[in-house]
UniProtKB/Swiss-Prot annotation:
InterPro entries: CHASE7, Diguanylate_Cyclase, GGDEF_dom, Nucleotide_cyclase, Rev_trsase/Diguanyl_cyclase. Its EC number is 2.7.7.65. Homodimer. This is Probable diguanylate cyclase DgcQ. Binds 1 Mg(2+) ion per monomer. The lineage of its organism: Bacteria, Pseudomonadati, Pseudomonadota, Gammaproteobacteria, Enterobacterales. The gene is dgcQ. It is found in: Cell inner membrane. It comes from Escherichia coli (strain UTI89 / UPEC).
Amino acid sequence: MGVVRVQHETKMENQSWLKKLARRLGPGHIVNLCFIVVLLFSTLLTWREVVVLEDAYISSQRNHLENVANALDKHLQYNVDKLIFLRNGMREALVAPLDFTSLRNAVTEFEQHRDEHAWQIELNRRRTLPVNGVSDALVSEGNLLSRENESLDNEITAALEVGYLLRLAHNSSSMVEQAMYVSRAGFYVSTQPTLFTRNVPTRYYGYVTQPWFIGHSQRENRHRAVRWFTSQPEHASNTEPQVTVSVPVDSNNYWYGVLGMSIPVRTMQQFLRNAIDKNLDGEYQLYDSKLRFLTSSNPDHPTGNIFDPRELALLAQAMEHDTRGGIRMNSRYVSWERLDHFDGVLVRVHTLSEGVRGDFGSISIALTLLWALFTTMLLISWYVIRRMVSNMYVLQSSLQWQAWHDTLTRLYNRGALFEKARPLAKLCQTHQHPFSVIQVDLDHFKAINDRFGHQAGDRVLSHAAGLISSSLRAQDVAGRVGGEEFCVILPGASLTQAAEVAERIRLKLNEKEMLIAKSTTIRISASLGVSSSEETGDYDFEQLQSLADRRLYLAKQAGRNRVCASDNA
């Protein structure tokens, strides 16, 4: 029996919990939950589309940058390959010079003029380039300069041979403005002619003091590799910056000089403008290895820089980990790629306004508008359905209340009272608690109706119902079961306690006068019958009500306005 009792208590608690949950999760909450789930899923789907679109945008930016970077790299690679070819030719000429009379005469002429402040050796202006040089005294003043080598004559003839190759290799369509060989022995060969001999020393010292020459000493360039430098030109009158690619010329572990090609940044800018697609937005910028701005494809920023120091630091930090990539800076997307044949990096800057005007911007705007439209329609639908459900719920609650209550007394009607009474009686029986019933009948109610009218009778019923309700405990249930008859259910109350409640009801009804008409008051009374499961152990509500009703009539027969709690009253 103990196990059955525990199982029943657990079942009742579960049912109570489910009822509480059902009351809390009303139709309105369920509608809200459904719409929130739909809104979340639609937002997640839209967000997923945005992520895919962003990945496609980043890939597009990198592809555009890669196309321009490859084109620039190929052009620079062509110049580097020419430089390597010239160095190989120079090395061959140093080891095995051509045995031409004109070359031997050039060596003799060098010996004749080497002490002069400035000199120039020229074989054939139409076929080769002249060798321009300075005196032994001027060479001795330089730390990196020296004529103390056994192959000096071979270097002179090799320079003339390279001059021939330089003249053939140099053309106006190339990005290279000047190609030259500068020797540590005090002379140079350049595709840019020196019109006056008196300018040779100035130009030579302009060459040998440039970073692209000094940077090829054995200490600075141990691997003897091709290097790129950004510098000002050797001509004081020309202030345009330039990029120089250079390579050392060595033979038998001796450093003879440097072969170099100078590329003005304006030609690189023109190349960038020609390489990009005119239908695409975005600005291309070229930086050297130290992130110093060289040039831009945007004519509005030919010498400017749109990055502040903080942004340059962020860009440099990102470039430390990869050779290509992208980063967002405020309303700009910056992608970069290091060039293979240039010691620098090409950067593409795409602003938000440019992105909005492009294809991805149009798709993004359309996607945003669709999401906003769907969300607006969803919110409107939620509001309409929520109002409808709320109104229906209020109407349902009102109808349910009317179905369960007496509209006049606002107590439970007969059917609802019986529905409430049965489970309460069963619960009391399960826990072996007493279960009591009080039957109430107003005395002389028909006379009040006949004398003062039904309106007054209704007021009496409403007044009596209010007094009965105020006399009950929180767990007690009252209802109207007939015209002037009321029934009170007292779960857990013994017969004595129920009789006390009944007496309290009787006193409240009898001690207060009520106004039923102008200057007319009456005092009402009631007869009450009380029954309890304690008497017979019977928890059947209908039997207990019948017993209480019989005792009520005993109270009426005994003179009315009294409580009868036994058959012997």
